[in-house]
């Protein structure tokens, strides 16, 4: 087949054809067929990500030598076996792809490549409020991949434009929160007008319909709903009435509305929004700095020009020396150069000092706001994040913001103004030599684009490899005793490391030549060689004065380095803006509000009585984790929450500690709604022991007395005795004065008992124990149970446990399933009922009851 300019360009960017062999074709709908293929080499270049597509070269149905290029989304993939499938809409009249898909037989082959422009859906670290998917039948394969990737608790709104009566027969992926709306096409505005008029704040839009419809959709998303550019993926998959894609010969392409080989990216321009997006958070945080940052950019441009001026004068001084100018003229130019050099340095220092003053004031106010905000956020906000992410927010992001305010804008402006200023000056001196300097720049930009395209699929793989190797390295270090005893060969880390190195070699080795050429293109020696060669030619032919080469020798050789500075300056700017976004998103988090007028306690409710009154709660709107739970906990009793994983046990307990606020209903302690209590007051009534025992850096005594810092040593030791941890503390190197921390040397059960001692000393009337024996060995578990028995005296205790034998003596056992109470009663009552609790017990949850009974006999 003929391969024209398009094929040459693709190959110059590193694209290569792979041969795919058809395995089978399956009719999914009357006009929708799935073609399954296999290619041993395709997935060396391609990455089977959701919504990623491949380029195919289809033969001309008229039998000519032309190949037509079309793009289709990967609907199935098994990279290890080299198998994949694409879905093709069969159009009438049929074009090259439809004709091929209708008639292709198993064993037929076709050329396919993965390079150049394939978009894919990347799951963000921070999920949006929901996904708005907009398209038509050609978009369904890609959207199905997205739907299968989106977590079940994230809503999806899907608008599909119907062009054919059979479009609705195309199967869609399943999702519990997916809502689909088919829109019959009347004109190009039909799809856009069908989008619900609502607040789409923090939603992400993926729009891939026909080109004319996309333009209308884009306008509505931008102008009426206020979607920012970063929250819209807009790409036309086909053009009504015009064939998409290219061909590899001179014959015209047949008209066919199919997915194009080069989908046309549409951009959305930010406009005043009715909604609010996290993507716009950085601009809100930096709004007070807008004028100073703009002014600093203008001043930085002037300072950069002032700093370039001495070099220009130095060049002119050299030209005067060569031409034999007088001493007075030389001294005048020399003193002017020195004066401008000093002036530029002083202006740069003054600008930096001014920006540091602005940054210091802004950073102080920001840190005060951030610390105040953190003190008012619900505890659930902290437990849902690792300490590393919070440290990054408070320390790293604020430092990145310092660079943004004080250095990023001046650096970025200087990186742009300096080469432009140099280039303008050199063009004034001699435009012919200056024009030659663009040669290495074009080479650099072309190679950079090629490397970006070739590395696209590998970048995702590299990120996954990095995450995998981090986990493997941690396991390798933790398993050193076993690895050394049984031999290093028994460790998978070495094999994984070899595979990782092989992946990096396979990725980077083919790019080595281009990277070397890119490095050479920006070196001063390259520019010097070009200047010397071009200048010599012009001087030898009497087209240029030799003295005019001096400016190029002084300034032209640094042109490449100045261009590299643009990337570094803009990189710092992007990092700072991302940090600003993280900080503002935190400042926008919902706080735990305290009602201004606390309600009086209800009559008849004891101070330690806890009431869950028709409580409903969900971590995301519309996805309840706790549903209409009503429950009363009496003083001096133990209430146990049991149920399968994900039933809502820990969530219900944390609601009592007000880690989050309920959506509906109320939780009362002593007759008062906990939302009417300040945090300090609430935690004098409710104490808790978390599933993972938390120790702070301090002595054992300080860890126990965390809630009562002024408690005397005698009270601390009494609490430790009641928690069955006193003897273990005495065995520590310095007893109660031993400094503990993350690596305290205490076992899981011992850490649990230490935190129980902390709760005992706090003497709260209500106590929450989340998985109190989760990390305990049998001996420690027995001691923890003894401590729990002591805690029930005159206290309301809520216990969560998966191991049912630990709560057989609870006064009340509540069985949860999917956030609802399905059973409640004592251990004996629930076993006799033969319901969910009985089934949990029979499946082995109570297998250790004999051990527990034996231990109970010794109490």
Curated annotation (Swiss-Prot):
UniProt-listed CDD domains: siderophore_interacting
ABC transmembrane type-1 domain boundaries: 293-575
Impact reported for residue 73 to A: Decrease in FAD-binding and loss of activity
EC number(s) on file: 7.2.2.-
Positions bound to FAD: 70-73, 87-91, 97-98
Residues in FAD-binding FR-type domain copies: 15-122
Residue ranges that the UniProt entry lists as topological domain Cytoplasmic: 1-292, 356-408, 454-519, 570-859
Domain of life of the organism encoding this protein: Bacteria
Residues given in the record as ATP binding sites: 643-650
Transmembrane segment boundaries: 293-313, 335-355, 409-429, 433-453, 520-540, 549-569
Membrane topology, Periplasmic segments: 314-334, 430-432, 541-548
Domain ABC transporter residues, every copy: 610-843
Alphabetic keyword roster: ATP-binding, Cell inner membrane, Cell membrane, FAD, Flavoprotein, Membrane, Nucleotide-binding, Translocase, Transmembrane, Transmembrane helix, Transport
A Pfam family the protein falls into: ABC_tran
InterPro entries found in the cross-reference section: AAA+_ATPase, ABC1_TM_dom, ABC1_TM_sf, ABC_transporter-like_ATP-bd, ABC_transporter-like_CS, FAD-bd_9_SIP, FAD-bd_FR_type, FNR_nucleotide-bd
Gene3D superfamilies from the UniProt entry: ABC transporter type 1, transmembrane domain (1.20.1560.10), Nucleotide-binding domain of ferredoxin-NADP reductase (FNR) module (3.40.50.80), P-loop containing nucleotide triphosphate hydrolases (3.40.50.300), Translation factors (2.40.30.10)
Keyword Cell inner membrane: yes
Membrane topology summary: Multi-pass membrane protein
Main location: membrane
Subunit structure: Forms a heterodimer with IrtB.
Function: Part of the ABC transporter complex IrtAB involved in the import of iron-bound mycobactin (Fe-MBT) and carboxymycobactin (Fe-cMBT). Mycobactins are then reduced by the siderophore interaction domain to facilitate iron release in the bacterial cell. Transmembrane domains (TMD) form a pore in the membrane and the ATP-binding domain (NBD) is responsible for energy generation. Required for replication in human macrophages and in mouse lungs.
Family that this chain belongs to: Belongs to the ABC transporter superfamily. Siderophore-Fe(3+) uptake transporter (SIUT) (TC 3.A.1.21) family.
Protein name (database record): Mycobactin import ATP-binding/permease protein IrtA
Lineage: Bacteria, Bacillati, Actinomycetota, Actinomycetes, Mycobacteriales
């Amino acid at each position: 087949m003929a391969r024209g300019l398009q094929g040459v360009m693709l190959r110059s960017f590193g694209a290569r054809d792979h041969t795919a062999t058809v395995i089978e074709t399956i009719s999914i709908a009357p006009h929708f067929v799935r073609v399954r293929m296999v290619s041993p080499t395709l997935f060396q270049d391609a990455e089977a990500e959701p919504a990623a597509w491949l380029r195919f070269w289809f033969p001309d149905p008229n039998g000519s030598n032309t190949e037509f290029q079309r793009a289709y989304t990967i609907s199935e993939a098994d990279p290890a076996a080299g198998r994949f499938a694409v879905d093709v809409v069969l159009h009438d009249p049929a074009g090259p792809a439809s004709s091929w898909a209708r008639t292709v037989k198993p064993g037929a082959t076709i050329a396919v490549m993965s390079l150049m422009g394939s978009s894919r859906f990347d799951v963000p670290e921070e999920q949006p409020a929901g996904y708005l998917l907009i398209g038509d039948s050609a978009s369904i394969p890609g959207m199905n991949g997205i739907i299968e990737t989106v977590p079940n608790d994230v809503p999806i709104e899907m608008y599909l434009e119907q062009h054919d009566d059979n479009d609705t027969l195309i199967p869609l992926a399943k999702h519990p929160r997916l809502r689909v709306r088919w829109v019959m096409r009347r004109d190009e505005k039909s799809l856009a007008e069908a989008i619900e008029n609502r607040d789409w704040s923090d939603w992400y839009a993926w729009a891939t319909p026909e080109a004319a419809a996309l333009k209308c959709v884009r306008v509505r998303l931008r102008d009426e709903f206020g979607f920012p550019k970063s929250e819209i993926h807009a790409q036309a998959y086909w053009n009504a009435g015009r064939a998409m894609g290219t061909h590899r010969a001179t014959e015209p392409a047949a008209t066919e509305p199919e997915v194009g080989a080069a989908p046309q990216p549409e951009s959305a321009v930010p406009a005043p929004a009715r909604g609010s997006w996290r993507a716009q958070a950085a601009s809100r945080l930096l709004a007070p700095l807008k004028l100073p940052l703009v002014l600093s950019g203008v001043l930085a441009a002037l300072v950069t020009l002032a700093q370039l001026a001495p070099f220009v004068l130095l060049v002119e001084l050299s030209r005067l020396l060569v031409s034999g100018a007088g001493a007075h003229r030389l001294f005048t130019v020399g003193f002017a150069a020195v004066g401008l050099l000093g002036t530029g340095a002083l202006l740069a220092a003054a600008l930096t000092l001014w920006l540091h003053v602005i940054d210091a004031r802004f950073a102080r106010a920001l840190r005060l706001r951030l610390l105040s905000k953190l003190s008012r956020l619900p505890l659930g906000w902290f437990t849902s994040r690792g300490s590393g992410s919070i440290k990054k927010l408070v320390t790293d992001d604020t430092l990145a913001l310092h660079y943004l305010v004080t250095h990023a804008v001046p650096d970025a402006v200087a990186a742009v103004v300096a080469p432009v200023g140099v280039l303008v000056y050199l063009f004034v001196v001699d435009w012919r030599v200056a024009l030659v300097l663009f040669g290495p720049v074009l080479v650099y930009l072309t190679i950079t684009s090629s490397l970006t395209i070739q590395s696209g699929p590998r970048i995702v793989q590299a990120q996954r490899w990095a995450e995998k190797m981090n986990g493997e390295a941690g396991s390798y270090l933790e398993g050193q005793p076993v690895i050394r005893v049984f031999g290093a060969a028994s460790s998978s880390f070495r094999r994984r490391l070899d595979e990782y190195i092989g992946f990096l070699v396979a990725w980077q080795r083919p790019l080595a030549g281009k990277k070397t050429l890119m490095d050479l293109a920006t070196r001063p020696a390259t520019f010097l060689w070009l200047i010397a060669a071009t200048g010599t030619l012009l001087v030898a032919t009497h087209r240029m004065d030799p003295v005019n080469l001096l400016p190029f020798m002084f300034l032209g050789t640094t042109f490449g380095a100045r261009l590299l500075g643009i990337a570094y300056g803009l990189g710092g700017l992007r990092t700072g803006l991302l940090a600003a976004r993280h900080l503002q998103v935190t400042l926008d988090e919902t706080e735990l509000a305290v009602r201004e007028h606390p309600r009086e306690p209800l009559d008849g409710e004891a101070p330690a009585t806890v009431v869950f009154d028709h409580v409903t709660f969900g971590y995301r709107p519309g996805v309840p984790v706790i549903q209409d739970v009503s429950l009363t906990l009496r003083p001096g009793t133990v209430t146990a929450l049991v149920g399968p994983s994900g039933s809502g046990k820990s969530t219900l307990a944390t609601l009592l500690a007000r880690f989050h606020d309920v959506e509906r209903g109320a939780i009362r302690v002593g007759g008062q709604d906990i939302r009417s209590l300040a945090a300090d007051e609430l935690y004098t009534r409710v104490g808790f022991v978390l599933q993972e025992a938390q120790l702070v850096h301090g002595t054992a005594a300080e860890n126990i007395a965390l809630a009562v810092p002024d408690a005397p040593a005698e009270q601390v030791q009494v609490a430790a005795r009641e928690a069955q941890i006193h003897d273990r503390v005495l065995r520590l190197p310095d007893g109660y004065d031993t400094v503990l921390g993350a690596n305290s040397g205490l076992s899981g059960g011992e850490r649990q008992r230490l935190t129980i001692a902390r709760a005992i000393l706090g003497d709260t009337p209500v106590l929450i124990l989340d998985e109190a024996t989760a990390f305990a060995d049998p001996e420690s578990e027995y001691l923890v149970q003894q401590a729990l028995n002591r805690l029930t005296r005159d206290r309301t205790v809520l216990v969560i446990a998966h191991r049912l034998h630990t709560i057989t003596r609870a006064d009340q056992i509540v069985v949860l399933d999917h956030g609802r109470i399905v059973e409640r009663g004592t251990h004996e009552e629930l076993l006799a009922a033969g319901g969910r609790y009985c089934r949990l017990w029979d499946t082995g949850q109570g297998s250790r009851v004999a051990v527990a009974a034996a231990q109970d006999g010794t109490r």
